[in-house]
Amino acid sequence: MISQPETPNLPCIPGTTKEVLAIMQLLKNNEVQFLCLEGEIATVAQGITYMESHSCIHFACHAHQNTQEPLKSEFMLHDGGLELADIIKRKLEGADLAYLSACQTSTGDEKLSEEAVHLAAGMLAAGYCGVVATMWSISDRHGPQVAEDFYAGLLSQNLEEPEQMHVLSTDNAALALHYSVQKLRKQLGDSALDWIPYVHFGL
């Protein structure tokens, strides 16, 4: 997990800390190994190294979508932006799931809707089998809730399949996101702009 609640020169997003702490507790309870980079240690170099050695990645940070030069779209870390171009260049063997808990990570260009190259599509191109992303800005209140419920859904499979203990099974990632979004929808009622943006790409 990579969390950046206080990115230099950008607004604070304290909800990322709450989000990551909740997910870490879920993983600990299921004895799933993980690594968390937060704050000053969440640098571009550390981030890409982390991605090369782990099958799943969770970004909880600001992101910048560059519609003119999509490969320059980036995740904003402590010392700068981790660009999509740099991620795609890497050999991410075993890449499985990427959860992009940042704003507008699947926003393309409305003039080229069938040729969209956004952060989510780029992560698929980099080798990830599945990507959870957002179509527009998300609430710092609701984002952590959706993420926590998503991982709780994934980990609930371990209870049904004991042999999956100590492993984060991503086979039903799309279904887990569906349930977590439906839970938020029931809570918010007609506030569609808050629950619609969460999407799953890939397998």
PLM feature spans:
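Catalytic cores of enzymes
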Residues: 1-203
